[in-house]
Amino acid sequence: MSIEYTPGPLLDAARNTPTALWNDSSDPSELAQSLSFGSVGATCNPTIAYTCINQRRDVWLPRIAELAKEMPNATESEIGWQVVRELSLEAAKLLEPIFEAENGRNGRLSMQTDPRLARSAKALADQAEEFHNLAKNIIVKIPATSVGVEAIEEATYRGVSVNVTVSFSVAQAVTTGEAIERGLKRREAEGKDTSQMGPVVTLMVGRLDDWIKEVAARDKMFLDPGHLEWCGVAAFKRAYQEFQKRGLRARMLSAAFRNVMHWSEFVGGDVVVSPPFKWAKLINDSDYKVEERMDIPVREDIMKTLLSIPEFVRAYEPDGMTPEEFDTFGGTVRTLRGFLQADADLDALVRDVIMPAP
């Protein structure tokens, strides 16, 4: 595959810093353009998959009708998830040359485990292994919940490269990073290969911003609103420091963009940034001059504001929450509910194809 690169800040950062660019979409046309910006990976989740299917209804609605005939005993959900598999594999194929060139560190397509399995560690690990076996460059998303922590370690032990998701806090990042490390060490103790595994731990920086803004409004806190744009940035930088200090091999990944700092503040770190395509295009079309900012602390006055918010402190401190508390954190609940709704929307889309309203 020959890539015609598009000059711009993203390409500059990709070529001149350790920071890897992924694309927060598995739509093949968007991914192809993102590769020209220097992208070396892609992510997907139920919401993204549903959006991608709707963007190419001319392709996927007829395919849903075909699958209904090929799978006469399948449920709406099973047909919908087969479409997700096929969509993901189409995108994964575009990334295979990068995967081979980088020995598995990049060139991966993220598939997400079914959010309806979130209560069972075994079901999550089993589905992660199934997705892992679909293509050599699949990485599998598992949520940073109390159940997910167990599934993350087990899936890693089975050889699955995991992308931790539904993660908003330093505590979630560190806890899941350590779970990945335990899984890797268990494999290595048994002489099993880990050389091509490329785990990442996502921190959904924009969704943390969203949640802390909600809390500040709910609690009628008088704050500089501009400072709240830095919640995710501050947490991500803290988590990155903890990973370095603890020697965790998984890379941090920045996702859920709300502003350009969710890329620019992390440039220079050995991390992954995964903007949606519209954000990637906005950044690459700009005249921004790339500067390595990963190790530059958030300003003291901003941190003073953020640390006055108890909910932010929970997200910022490495021991700010227990795994059981991950499950009830506002960002976790809101995001899982959103993913479950996207699953329900996909079911409804399949239903409209195979049983259109009269």
Predicted regions and their residues:
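N- or domain-start disorder-to-order transition segments that initiate the globular core
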Residues: 1-29, 33
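Short, surface-exposed connector motifs at secondary-structure boundaries
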Residues: 13-16, 132-138, 154-162, 242-249
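Hydrophobic faces of well-ordered beta-strands that scaffold small-molecule active sites
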Residues: 19-25, 40-44, 107-113, 138-142, ...
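Generic hydrophobic/aromatic pocket-lining and core-packing "Φ" positions
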Residues: 31, 128, 149-152, 173, ...
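Active-site beta->alpha loop and helix N-cap motifs at the rims of alpha/beta catalytic domains
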Residues: 39, 48-51, 56-147, 151-152
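Glycine-rich tight-turn/loop motif centered on a GG-T
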Residues: 56-84, 159-163, 186, 214-229
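Catalytic alpha/beta core domains of metabolic enzymes, predominantly
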Residues: 161-292
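C-terminal extensions of enzymes
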Residues: 292-358
